[in-house]
Amino acid sequence: MTTETLVSGTTPVSDNANLKQHLTTPTQEGQTLRDSVEKALHNYFAHLEGQPVTDVYNMVLCEVEAPLLETVMNHVKGNQTKASELLGLNRGTLRKKLKQYDLL
């Protein structure tokens, strides 16, 4: 599948088994993206040393969302319209998130 097909919206990523497979295929280190996140969270909780923690969801979301946005923007050579279509986000929402992570 080409990027143009993705950007045109003809085949949502969630419906494409080949694209989803790239996210669940182990890396050279043998870990999927899911495995990496799980390992990082286990490591995070193991090193809290009794400190109270809140807002883990937002912490994880920020850690994943920032590199996702940066990588997509690099892939589309800074074209926000293409990036918003590729991500399935409203262009205004994309701009807000890019500003949030100092990527704009």
Curated annotation (Swiss-Prot):
Q: Mind telling me which InterPro entries this protein's record contains?
A: Fis_DNA-bd (IPR005412), Homeodomain-like_sf (IPR009057), HTH_Fis (IPR002197), Trans_regulatory_Fis (IPR050207)
At the top level, the lineage of the source is Bacteria
Query: Which positions are tagged coiled coil?
Result: none
Annotated GO biological process: regulation of DNA-templated transcription
Q: Which residues bind DNA?
A: 80-99
Molecular functions (GO terms): sequence-specific DNA binding
Question: Is the Methyltransferase keyword given for this protein?
Answer: no
Task: Note one Pfam family from the annotation.
Answer: HTH_8
> What keywords tag this UniProt record?
DNA-binding
Q: Which family does the entry's similarity section mention?
A: Belongs to the transcriptional regulatory Fis family.
Q: What is this protein called?
A: Putative Fis-like DNA-binding protein
Organism equals: Pseudomonas aeruginosa (strain ATCC 15692 / DSM 22644 / CIP 104116 / JCM 14847 / LMG 12228 / 1C / PRS 101 / PAO1)
